[in-house]
Amino acid sequence: MKRLLALLATGVSIVGLTALAGPPAQAATGCKAEYTITSQWEGGFQAGVKITNLGDPVSGWTLGFTMPDAGQRLVQGWNATWSQSGSAVTAGGVDWNRTLATGASADLGFVGSFTGANPAPTSFTLNGATCSGSVTDPPTDPPTDPPATGTPAAVNGQLHVCGVHLCNQYDRPIQLRGMSTHGIQWFGPCYGDASLDRLAQDWKSDLLRVAMYVQEDGYETDPAGFTSRVNGLVDMAEDRGMYAVIDFHTLTPGDPNYNLDRARTFFSSVAARNDKKNVIYEIANEPNGVSWTAVKSYAEQVIPVIRAADPDAVVIVGTRGWSSLGVSDGANESEVVNNPVNATNIMYAFHFYAASHKDDYRAAVRPAATRLPLFVSEFGTVSATAWSVDRSSSVAWLDLLDQLKISYANWTYSDADEGSAAFRPGTCEGTDYSSSGVLTESGALVKSRISTTDDFPTS
């Protein structure tokens, strides 16, 4: 139910906003926002934001801003879908205000808490674009910007989270598309110079996810050796202009706290190489059989270890139910939205296997993507246990991820004797990693998607 804002305010901040989501290509864009603290008491306050569309009519929008003080928290809101991750707050349009005509406004409000000062936000974004306060008219003959040239890492530089998006050095939302290794303890021959050359040049992959199992003959058997292998693959990805997702591949036991000490040791070592600007840290692959509270506790103990050495890198946090945001356990994103990890510059993992996870899972991701920064750090074109590729569901998933600008890594860039592998068995004994003769049905499908031109905005 809509609520009216109080007429008297204790503080007001007016900021112009541009780049509302939803207008057609080459539409005039622009809007303004008025932030009002309507009441304040010890440790709490109520605020409102009035958005007025100054440009062409829009359908669909997400407002973002940063709480200036670390002690400020969103408690609950209305007239929008609200969420907070660290200090970043987002509000997405709902059914009755999702469409804004020229000159139309939406009145939003929320209750917050604070422990120190309670300053008003000074900057707002819409879909990751910094607000400027003016209307931008389309050119009579709009120019066609050529795709940015250079490798993904060279173009985008140091990544960060802005609102619910992964953003590049130009503060623009981007989508990374790439492949995950299988367990590096089993498929080392698949990750040499020849295969990674083809991944970067022929597959045009933006990223390599390095899956380092902790158990199952993995890290716990040789911490120093596996750390060295991971660092080597990060360097090889960097040499080819790809981002590297360092995956602490926990699976069994499902509670990541079982490996807390190992995680601290491992991430302290790999984060010490903080000159690497192509690294994203994934701290727990697929928590399962464990509560979100326990996963959150683990994350809040591991992230400070990374931040002590590498303060700027993005960190991906696994979610319960095999990183399904709890959907596989009958929950949804609300448990994360209402109890987020107390850290900034983080994203939340969502994993799916297309033949098992279909419309109901896609229906869960759509609203979650307006409330949380999501990264599909692992997905398969098959079921979680079977071989056959579900092409229809896989395409539906990839179309959705493209639409929502959610980054992804496909399981797996390997010649494992399983349906989700990109290559036929024995491929990694040779030098061909691209032709139809070595690709499986899954490999051919995924390669056809990630080898298309990237959309990396630079202005």
Curated annotation (Swiss-Prot):
Residues 129-151 are annotated as: Disordered. It catalyses: Endohydrolysis of (1->4)-beta-D-glucosidic linkages in cellulose, lichenin and cereal beta-D-glucans. It is an enzyme of class 3 (hydrolase). GO terms for biological process: cellulose catabolic process. Residues 1-27 form the signal peptide. Its EC number is 3.2.1.4. PROSITE patterns: CBM2 (PS51173), CBM2_A (PS00561), GLYCOSYL_HYDROL_F5 (PS00659). Residues 28-134 form the CBM2 domain. Residues 148-357 are annotated as: Catalytic. The linker region (also termed 'hinge') may be a potential site for proteolysis. The active site is at E286, E378. PANTHER family: ENDO-BETA-1,4-GLUCANASE A, GLYCOSIDE HYDROLASE FAMILY 5 DOMAIN-CONTAINING PROTEIN. This is Endoglucanase CelA. It comes from Streptomyces lividans. The lineage of its organism: Bacteria, Bacillati, Actinomycetota, Actinomycetes, Kitasatosporales. The gene is celA.
